[in-house]
Each structure stands twice: as structure tokens, then as C-alpha cells.
Amino acid sequence: MSGSQDLNDSIRIYNEQLAQVEQALEGTSSGPERESLINLKSDLEELVKLTLETVQHENGDDLNAAASGSNEDDEFALFMREINALDDPGSVDAKPPKPDEVSVDEQEPFKDLVGSKCSAPHIHKWGSKSYHNALICSLDASDLDDVAAKVLFINPTHQEMVPCAYFLEGDCKFNDEMCRFSHGELISINELKEYREPRFELLRKKGCKVLAKNRNRIWSKGTIQTADFETKTCKIQMDEGRHEVELQFENVLPLEGDDVPSSDSESNSDSDEENEDDVVSLQQAQIIERSLLNPAPDQRLGDWEKHTKGIGSKIMLKMGYVVGAGLGSKGEGIVVPVSAQVLPQGRSLDYCMQLREQANGDKNLFSVEKKLQREKRIQEKRDAKNYAANKSKKDVFNFLNSEIFGSSNGSSSSSGSKKPAAKDNQMDLPSCSSKNLNIASLKLSEQMRRLELDIDRLSHSLTRHQPGSKMHSNLQKQIAEKRREISEIKKTEYSISREQQLRNDKRKMTVF
């Protein structure tokens, strides 16, 4: 009775734990924690059920023992039959002795396996053997030397492997041999292997082989086209029919190199290569995912190579480096390049630390890159300021470029509108230096010489065309325009020479 009392105490403890788990489930909304609580609840319920069966079994054995002890006549008759069987070995009534029944304590270590997942073998009709994920639903521990487990396959690939829905509900009218579906397969516990968790990260690779659940509950082979890890859905192209379906991750089983169903035409080398490709793609996907969690750096690693051929970055990319990730095979190294620091010359480290403290701990205080950027910004501002000053400044060269040299592209009508501007610009001649006036006078003389040569060339061409023709008229217009430009240049030369004469007279008067 002490064993039954211990089991009753265990049942009470299990019920208290089950109540605590249900209370925790009410306060948990979703996520992996809720899934673990649901699994724990199912395990506790299964444990309570098994413990109750054990208590009932022990109570039944005690009652049978009491009944057999009270009936002495039956025991005496049984004893006499056994004596007669020993005296007459050839007697028809002789029966072999029953094997010793396995005690409940010896079966106890195997009861924890009920409800657990494993990888169990299945022998197909054509004789091939393959392992599939399965669930242990019961155990046959009558012989401790050969304990058998009844399993139901989680991802059945053929009809004889699909669990019978009516059998699970207890309503199937057929026995194990007559039913088209599976009532569970008895497999030696020594042949079971560890359960393989689905590796959904393999779905990131396009072309990954998977088993997909059909409407008839049979899992068929397919190929991944796209996968969305936010909605937990993926598009699969089935090998049979070549049609595409969209399924949740829970209805998909990614196949690794060892899980792909083998055939006579497939070789082991192909599966090994696919497994290696999956490992490489998985590592690269993990590196990319880790790089997305890093903050965006201010400077790209290898940014200095824009001034070179960039051979270093090309070599790193061929070696598997992912842009934006850290250095190293797993992308756990530095992302931001080490910045060069230039400390003040002839100063101690204490003085440099004091300067950094005064700058509120600025890490870029002695950075070479930051210093070059500051100098670049200062130079850009200085250049912009000088450009604005030069643009607003009016001298004789601006006057020549805008009024004299630029008038060759204008028409006679535009020349009339430029005359007032020329008069205004002539008022700026006193602000020009004597050197600039001399250079401007030289340029005007050179421009006048070129215009006179153009007039001679056009006049020579004019003699080759008949008067009144279109070409003759165009040449006359060009000659008139050149002469007008010469007239403008002469006026400007006169203004410059007059300004120079005024300066000479003023200098002489000053000396006098």
C-alpha cells in the first residue's frame, strides 16, 4: 500500500503543477513562452494519466492476490494439475509455464518516452528503409530485452504512414491489417533515433528542398520559391504537377542533406554538395541579419579605396565578406574603420586628455579625417566668398569681355541697348590700376587686328559672288558687323587712352 500512497501523492503534486501552468497560460498572450507552457501542460496531463493507470493496475493486482489467497481449493486443484503434468509430459492437458510478468517498477523508466518525439524507421512496400519524424504513443515493455514502441509518423510521405483519424478517436471499424491508414507501427526501441527539429532558417535560400503537407495529409516534395519570415508563409513549387502553393511554416519541413529521400538515380555526392551549400547560405544569412542590427556607420569600411583601384575590397568580397557586416568569418569584428589620431606635437598625454575633457570627451578631437573635413569646409567657404567678391567686382577686363568681345555674338539691335551700359562701365575706369589699363589696351589692339583681318578675308570672298545673291548679302552684313565692332573698340581705346593721359597729367601736376 505504500507504493499506491506514493503514487497518489505524485498525482496530487502533478495536479497542483497543472493548475499553476493553466494560470500562467491565462497571463501569457503569445510567443515561444506560451508554446513551451502548452507543451508542459500536455506532458503533465499525460503524466497524470499514466500515474492513474499505474495506481489502478496495482489495486487490481492486490485484489487478485487476495482473492487467490482466500480460495484454497482452487489453489490445491491447480497444484494437482501441475503435478500430473510433470508425471505425464505427453499429456494433452500439459501447458507451458507462463513467463514472469514484468513489474511496474521495471516499466517505470520507459513510461517517460510516451508522448515524446523521435525519428523512427519505415520500411516501404518495395523494401527501402527511411527514417521519419514520429510520435511515441505507447510502449510494449512485456519483454525488457526487446522493448517495442508504437509510433505515429508526423510527416507521412505515403498513405500507409498517415495516422487513421478514426483510430485516434477510437471509432475505427477495421483492424490494423485491414485499415488503409496507420494505427501505429511497432518498432524496437533500439532502432529509434533522436528527433530532428525543423530548421526553418534554410527556407531563406531559394531552391531549398522541402516536404509540404497536402490536403490528403500526405507530405510531398517541393522547392522553395520565396519565404516571408514576418508572416511565416512561403511559396513552394511542387515536384508533382509543377504547381505553386502557399503554406504556413508549420506545414513545411525543410530537408537537409540526410533527410532528402534517396533514389537509385541520386548519388551521395549531390546530397553532400547541397548540404554544404545550405550551410554556407545559412552562415551568410546570419551575417546579413546581424549586420542589419548594427547602426549605420558614418564611414564605409574601405572608403579610402575610392582614390585607388580598390583591390582590397575585391579580394574581401571573393573571400565571403558582406558589405556592412563586421570583419571575421562570423561577421563579429569591427564595422567602422580605425580612425587615425594625430596628437599635438611636443605635448604629454595628460595634456591631450585634458584637451579632450575640455571638449566634453569628443572622440574625434584628434581624428585626421575630421580635421581634413574641417579644413575642407573652411576652404570651400573661403572659395565661395572669393568667387562672390570677384563676381561683383567691375574692372576693365569685365568691361572688355561683356561689351566689346561679347558684342560679336549680338545683333545690331542689341548693340543699341548696350551703349548705356558701356557708358556706365566707362565710369569704372578710374578705379582700375594702370597695369590693368595697359593690358586692356594691348588686348583691344590685338582684337582690332583680328577684326581687320576678318574684314579683308570677307571682302575677298565678296568679290567671288554676284551682287544681289543671298551669299553676297550675308557677306555684306558680316563686314558691316565687323566694322561696327572696330568702331566700338576704337571708342574704348579712346576712353582708356584718355584715362591714362589724365593720370599722367595728374602725376605731373603732383610732382610740380
From Swiss-Prot:
SMART domains: G_patch, ZnF_C3H1. It is found in: Nucleus. Signal peptide: none annotated. Gene3D superfamilies: 2.30.30.1190. Keywords: DNA-binding, Metal-binding, Nucleus, Repressor, Transcription, Transcription regulation, Zinc, Zinc-finger. A zinc finger (C3H1-type) spans 159-186. Residues 308-354 form the G-patch domain. One of its GO terms (molecular function) is RNA polymerase II cis-regulatory region sequence-specific DNA binding. PROSITE patterns: G_PATCH, ZF_C3H1. Residues 255-280, 407-432 are annotated as: Disordered. GO terms for cellular component: nucleus. It holds the Pfam family G-patch. Transcription repressor. This is Zinc finger CCCH-type with G patch domain-containing protein. It comes from Aedes aegypti.
